[in-house]
Amino acid sequence: MKRKLQNITSKAYSVAAIVVLLFVWQILSSAGIVPSFLLPSPLEVVQAFVKDFPLLMEHAKVTLTEGFLGLTLGVVIGFVAAVLMDHFQGFYKAFYPIMVITQTIPTIAIAPLLVLWMGYEMAPKVTLIVIVTFFPIAIGLLEGFQSADKDTVNLLKAMGANRLQIFLHVKFPSSLGRFFASLRISVSYCVVGAVISEWLGGYNGLGVYMTRVR
């Protein structure tokens, strides 16, 4: 009963914070403190959402498709990279610095180059999403593999287990927690990456919609 009351109280605080935020937002916009073209009021946002709902869904479908494809490829590439870096020290030393370098370049700087090289279709968007999502996946999985219990690994080796068996029964299960934490980060990255690339060139998508209605 006490725990249930705590959950209700916690949710009430969250709802109250959202209500206060919306109220302040409405006041700032209605009073003209912030111009409406910079910060439309919540009511204007709801009205625009209802009015443009079919068009929004059409553009959202494109953005979500790009996000899904890019995230899927990012997870696959990140998984393969993590496995190779875990198994081969030479690959780790050669590939890890390149991974870090790709993450130091701002996304907004990479996107125009990808659009220039690949055109205005889906390819540059998916490529950008892969670039921004595979790194968290690869690092999360690699840390998970390396956090596997050493005693268990040594025991399996003593019993004659090969690398694949050790990976499937010890390393992979121990990496799942970090994998899902990294996946949660990558999901947010994939949507942001898709919208940014659509801003800079494209025919459909939420980024294109935002540019047109600005």
Residue ranges and their predicted role:
Residues 127, 131, 164-196:
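Transmembrane alpha-helices
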Residues 116, 145, 192-214:
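Glycine-rich helix-loop "coupling/hinge" segments at transmembrane-helix boundaries
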Residues 49, 56-60, 64, 94-101, ...:
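Hydrophobic alpha-helical elements at and bordering transmembrane segments
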Residues 69-99, 116:
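Transmembrane-helix boundary motif in ABC transporter permease subunits
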Residues 145-151, 155-175:
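Short helix-to-coil transition segments within interhelical loops
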Residues 3, 31-72:
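Periplasmic/extracellular loop-to-transmembrane helix junction in inner-membrane transport proteins
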Residues 100-136, 143-144:
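Generic hydrophobic transmembrane alpha-helix motif, especially the helices
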Residues 1-19:
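Transmembrane alpha-helical segments of polytopic membrane transport and secretion proteins
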